[in-house]
Amino acid sequence: MERNYPKIQITDKAARSLRSGHPWVYADEVLQADAACVDGQIVDVTTRSGHWLGAGFYNSASKIRVRVLSRNANDRFDEAFWARRIRYAVDYRRTVMGQDFDNCRLIFGEADGFPGLTVDRFGPILVAQVLSLGMELRKQQLFALLLQTLHADGAQIDAIYERNDVKLRQKEGLEQGTGFVTLDGLRTDLNGHVTIRENGILYDVDYIHGQKTGFFLDQKYNRRAAAQLAQGKHVLDCFTHTGAFGLNCAAAGAASVLSVDVSEDALTTARHNAALNGLQDRVEYLCADVFDLLTKLAEQKRGEYDYIILDPPAFTKSSATVANAIRGYKEINLKAMRILPRGGYLATCSCSHFMTDDRFRAMLADAARDAQVSLRQIEARQQGPDHPILWNVPETDYLKFYLFQIV
């Protein structure tokens, strides 16, 4: 097939990275770019000697200069190409999610071959984030193809809402914004709330004002795993956000649940979710700084909780702040270990890619040593399979979740 795309030549180091399967070319890895390269459009990527490596989206305004789409020289980036990719992504979710297909991540960026595009499904609502220029220029086409695919499978989709209110867009030269997508058959007059069921628990998802796309689907099966230990336990659910871990534990028969968050708005949503499930009398809510609360409980050594869940926000979003993040993670885990009695249980996690599993495990080992306890590992888990991990793209591997008994 004759190729008419502009070319960029990259360094030997970048070529090795692409050959290993990583899809990004950084600005300082570009040796030469044709004058015909246009931001947001397809370019061919070659070695310094001209050997073809792949094709992807070019953006001179981004530190990620090229996001590789394909290493198949026969690919034509037409509607049929995108329709195939969408079909693969949807079929994969139908296979791995089964009955949970109604509420899952349908498209997970690079892991599905859509660099910079995320789409979550909450029943009849799709919520999208577009974080690359290449996807921005094609989003209407992709949304239409996704709708066609879902409708062909019998799924009812009422609306698509864009949550492009993220600073990452600025790194691509894109403005922030939100709003309903206008396409034939879609509504644009909804109130921004949808009720979903996950693990048997009902949640009110605020996809207009909630964090990220409105609800963290990646912890779906970790919540279920955590709930399996909860029967008869006195649970301290830290960083509860919309209350999901605590509600799963209450529904599983916990003796008591105290769910804590520093945000009163989050707790208002959590209380509403408890009421949706008839669990309002089974869960208490406390607006407090978790660091301060754990410090107080560790000093008291009262041992009133025998199960602590730590689901903090990402303490680091760059390699530059990893050291500070490790200190933060260690502080909350160390205090939790000191609060728990021997035989108590700890669920702990990190949602930062930069806090690698090796770093997280080392931090937990340090905390256990300082607390003079041993950790009996029950499970080591990760994000759900609707957030697939590509081994050659470490950025797709971000969520660590551990269940321990303190011995």
Which residues does each PLM region occupy?
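Conserved SAM-binding motif I beta-strand of class I
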Residues: 256-261
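Mobile active-site "lid"/loop adjacent to the S-adenosyl-L-methionine
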Residues: 305-335
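S-adenosyl-L-methionine
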Residues: 265-309
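Conserved SAM-binding loop of SAM-dependent methyltransferases across substrates and taxa
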Residues: 228, 242-255
